[in-house]
Amino acid sequence: MAETQTVNPMRKLRLEKVTVNIGVGEAGERLQKAYQLLQELTGVKPVYTIAKRTIREFGVRKGAPIGVKVTLRGKKAEEFLNKVLAAVGHRIKASSFDEYGNVSFGIAEHVLIPGTRYDPEIGIFGMDVAITLVRPGFRVARRRRKKAHIPKRHRTVSKEEAMEFLKQNFNVTIVEG
């Protein structure tokens, strides 16, 4: 009897969220343009990120808005991730992965994303994209009622598992560096 090994459905990885951040470093007109751009790219209303402390050399005060970010989940996250990966040529450095299954990479100019055009009124912005991968059942540790501990073997997503997930689902090539 040849037994076929089945994969436990609770061990399969899934895309939890994609977080897109544009750090401007100052409040004002440029921050408003970044807000408008991020809203056009994602179709979701961004939130302002706030400076944690004062840095006099950069002219940043604690509590001042210095950037914008958006968190995408579900289908919107997958669609946006496909567009953004096309901008980087479906290649991600191995050093972009951490030991918890998170991946981060940057885009130098937003005009590299397919389907976007240069608008002289907005200008050009770079952005950071962070991908978070989890296993099913992780909500048990985060919910308000009846929280429960999740063992480390199920909680953590290894670097290799995250690389394999992106290779299979998004045709990503991992580049050493």
UniProtKB/Swiss-Prot annotation:
Q: Which InterPro entries match?
A: Ribosomal_uL5, Ribosomal_uL5_arc, Ribosomal_uL5_C, Ribosomal_uL5_CS, Ribosomal_uL5_dom_sf, Ribosomal_uL5_N
Q: Which GO terms describe its cellular component?
A: ribonucleoprotein complex; ribosome
**What SUPFAM superfamilies has UniProt attached to this entry?**
RL5-like (SSF55282)
Q: Does the keyword DNA repair apply?
A: no
What keywords are assigned to this protein?
Ribonucleoprotein, Ribosomal protein, RNA-binding, rRNA-binding, tRNA-binding
Establish whether keyword Ribonucleoprotein is in the entry: yes
- Sorted alphabetically, which Gene3D superfamilies does this protein's record hold? 3.30.1440.10
Q: Which Gene Ontology molecular function entries are recorded, alphabetically?
A: rRNA binding; structural constituent of ribosome; tRNA binding
Provide the GO biological process annotations: translation
Report the function annotation for this chain: This is one of the proteins that bind and probably mediate the attachment of the 5S RNA into the large ribosomal subunit, where it forms part of the central protuberance. In the 70S ribosome it contacts protein S13 of the 30S subunit (bridge B1b), connecting the 2 subunits; this bridge is implicated in subunit movement. May contact the P site tRNA; the 5S rRNA and some of its associated proteins might help stabilize positioning of ribosome-bound tRNAs.
Q: Summarize the subunit comment.
A: Part of the 50S ribosomal subunit; contacts the 5S rRNA and probably tRNA. Forms a bridge to the 30S subunit in the 70S ribosome.
Protein family: Belongs to the universal ribosomal protein uL5 family.
Q: What protein name applies here?
A: Large ribosomal subunit protein uL5
